[in-house]
């Protein structure tokens, strides 16, 4: 792979990829996933206290499911109490970046409506996570479900801050307009805009649900009753 050709070796610590800071291994995985169209990727890494840069070329060999750079994560370490808080914050940041990158891919057409998930998709994902984690025990189930919860929370937070009517981001736009104009926007007009935005969001939710598999819910209900 390209990493070995460019001189990277075991023990090197990647600190940046494509200009983004790397705090956890998932940061690298996310960049590769959401920037798979890039032919070259610049990375910054540390070795023996010195900073180096290299330009890597993603390559997909036989048996690979996606183009790879040739780097892997190191061994897991116990960072202590405060370190756990720090890396917990990095994990939340990762899920926020994941949400923002997903929106970017949606806007640019790299993903379509079939890739969106609504309530049905969320239930399906949670059930899938539970089924995979169940053999490993209760602690793994709780940890994986917490990760799903963080993802959903990050999605809701980012979406709510978008400058769209009916969302907090839309309300913020009106506050900025009022600050520039020096007077308040008519409450009736603002209410109409937010109502129209809410209606469009409901339509979008229905469209997304039609692209999912409602039969999944019926199957779950049958399994539960059995």
Task: State each model region's role.
Residues 2, 27, 121, 172, ...:
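Residue-level recognition of oxygen-bearing side chains
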Residues 151-160, 200-208:
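Alpha-helical transmembrane segments of multi-pass membrane proteins
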Residues 162-172:
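Transmembrane helix boundary and interhelical junction motifs in multipass membrane proteins
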Residues 3-26, 92:
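Conserved PDZ fold ligand-binding element
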């Amino acid at each position: 792979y390209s990493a070995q050709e460019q001189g990277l070796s075991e023990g090197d610590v990647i600190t940046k990829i494509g200009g983004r800071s790397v705090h956890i291994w998932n940061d690298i995985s996310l960049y590769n996933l959401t920037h798979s169209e890039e032919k070259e990727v610049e990375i910054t890494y540390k070795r023996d206290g010195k900073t180096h840069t290299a330009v890597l070329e993603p390559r997909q060999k036989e048996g690979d499911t996606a183009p790879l750079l040739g780097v892997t994560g190191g061994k897991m370490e116990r960072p202590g109490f405060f370190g756990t808080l720090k890396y917990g914050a990095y994990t939340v940041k990762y899920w926020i970046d994941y949400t923002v990158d997903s929106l970017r891919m949606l806007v640019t057409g790299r993903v379509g409506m079939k890739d969106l998930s609504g309530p049905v998709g969320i239930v399906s994902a949670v059930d899938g996570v539970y089924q995979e984690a169940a053999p490993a025990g209760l602690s793994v189930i709780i940890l994986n479900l917490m990760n799903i919860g963080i993802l959903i929370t990050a999605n809701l937070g980012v979406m709510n801050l978008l400058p769209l009517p009916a969302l907090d981001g839309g309300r913020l736009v009106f506050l900025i307009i009022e600050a520039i104009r020096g007077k308040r926007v008519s409450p009736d007009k603002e209410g109409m805009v937010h109502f129209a935005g809410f209606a469009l969001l409901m339509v979008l939710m229905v469209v997304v649900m039609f692209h999912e598999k409602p039969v999944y819910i019926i199957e779950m209900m049958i399994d539960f009753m059995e």
